């Protein structure tokens, strides 16, 4: 049974004697909803939603291109401090952390949203309003997640909520593109190594729950040769021709529809002049799957295709070894999944149902990939509202009933912070 008592002006929540009961006991999420402190925090979320939206806009209008998240991170640091989080700090990677102690250090829940966007430096990040719709690069992905982090802390403060376990709120770096989850790797390999029991990332919009983790491998492939004049040195093996052969082979890959497995040559470059045989050409390749074996299979096909392309281009001109190739791994996100009956997954769906809503289950590539690969119960949830055109300059966020995502994230956090 839950019971609520007051101490030093703070409402203390004592609910469930074990995590198992929180996840298995009939009506356990409903029991939390009967708790006066929890009800107060949920009400505060709805009341505070205009402020949450203003925070979302404020964060979004601070540029945070890949590897340059510091300015936005500083804004989160100040906000964490203003909300009274403890030990607010920036770690070696640039993650911003703020600690909210519970009655005991464990269980320790980490809630995270990422600072970075996919948009390059110089992008106009001003947010435009049209009724309930906000438009701006990154407004949903992941400025909504950052605003929800702040809203959870604010609502718990407003209602005087304390939980048995502790929480750390993290605004992290390096989730997008070639960031390669560097923020998560720093967080779990050093900053909070061995200290985290559960992890929830808030990334994207709506009420989806992702507990299947799309892994990816990303390479920058560089073909090199002697180069020379297009007429005078004709007959030299051409790095761009080798690149073209490789792209043609990759485009013919056959991959399974289930588990969904994909490949993409996203960027290419090279050469110095129309009348010069290039000395270098490069491409960037992305491969994804939620299944580790399927990802390994397409990865093996990729290596074979590139090596064969170089051999064929050298053979074409009868000059073996003239061209060389390097394949630099620039991104490695582990694939995996949690079963639907995993405690953290059941809790997320139970909390959603207790609030009277439904949630879809899907796969995603988010910050949750990395802690999940370490065996830490992890998942990703949407931050509410409705997002469209993610990763596009016209990215939009419909604020209609967006408070629902914050309420769900708040109730999930409280449930997971129970003993």
Show the residue positions of the predicted features.
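Acidic-glycine-rich active-site phosphate/pyrophosphate-binding loop
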Residues: 115-130, 196, 211-222, 350
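Metal-dependent amide/peptide-bond hydrolase catalytic core
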Residues: 23-40, 56, 239-419
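A non-catalytic alpha/beta surface segment that caps or lines the substrate-entry region
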Residues: 53-106
């Amino acid at each position: 049974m839950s019971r609520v008592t007051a101490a030093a002006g703070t409402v203390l929540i004592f609910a469930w004697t074990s995590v198992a009961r929180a996840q298995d006991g009939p009506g356990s999420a409903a029991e939390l909803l009967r708790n006066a402190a929890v009800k107060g925090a949920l009400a505060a979320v709805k009341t505070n939603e205009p402020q949450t939206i203003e925070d979302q806009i404020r964060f979004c209008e601070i540029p945070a291109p890949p590897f340059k998240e510091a300015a936005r991170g500083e804004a989160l640091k100040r906000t964490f401090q203003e909300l009274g989080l403890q030990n607010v700090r920036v770690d070696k990677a640039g993650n911003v952390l703020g600690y909210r102690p519970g009655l005991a250090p464990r269980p320790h829940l980490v809630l995270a949203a990422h600072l970075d966007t996919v948009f390059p430096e110089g992008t106009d990040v001003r947010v435009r309003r049209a009724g309930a719709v906000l438009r701006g690069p990154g407004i949903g992905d992941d400025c909504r997640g950052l605003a929800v982090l702040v809203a959870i802390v604010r609502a718990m403060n407003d209602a005087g909520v304390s939980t048995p376990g502790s929480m750390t709120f993290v605004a992290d770096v390096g989730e997008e593109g070639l960031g390669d989850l560097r923020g998560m790797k720093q967080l779990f390999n050093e900053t909070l190594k061995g200290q985290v029991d559960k992890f929830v990332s808030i990334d994207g919009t709506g009420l989806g729950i992702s507990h299947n983790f799309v892994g990816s491998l990303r390479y920058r492939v560089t073909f090199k040769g002697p180069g020379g004049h297009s007429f005078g040195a004709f007959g030299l093996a051409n790095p761009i021709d080798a690149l073209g052969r490789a792209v043609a082979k990759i485009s013919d890959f056959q991959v399974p529809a289930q588990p969904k497995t994909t490949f993409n040559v996203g960027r290419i470059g090279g050469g110095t002049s129309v009348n010069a045989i290039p000395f270098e050409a490069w491409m960037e390749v992305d491969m994804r799957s939620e299944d580790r074996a399927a990802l390994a299979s397409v990865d093996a096909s990729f290596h074979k295709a590139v090596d064969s392309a170089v051999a064929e281009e050298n053979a074409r001109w009868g000059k073996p070894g003239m061209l060389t190739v390097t394949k630099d791994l620039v991104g490695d996100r582990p694939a995996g999944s949690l079963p639907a009956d995993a405690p953290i997954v059941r809790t997320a769906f139970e909390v959603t149902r207790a609030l009277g809503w439904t949630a879809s289950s899907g796969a995603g590539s988010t910050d949750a990939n990395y802690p999940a690969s370490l065996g830490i119960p992890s998942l990703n949830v949407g931050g509410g509202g409705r997002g469209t055109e993610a990763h596009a300059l016209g990215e939009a966020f419909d604020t209609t009933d967006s408070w629902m995502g914050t309420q769900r994230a708040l109730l999930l956090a409280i449930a997971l912070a129970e003993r």
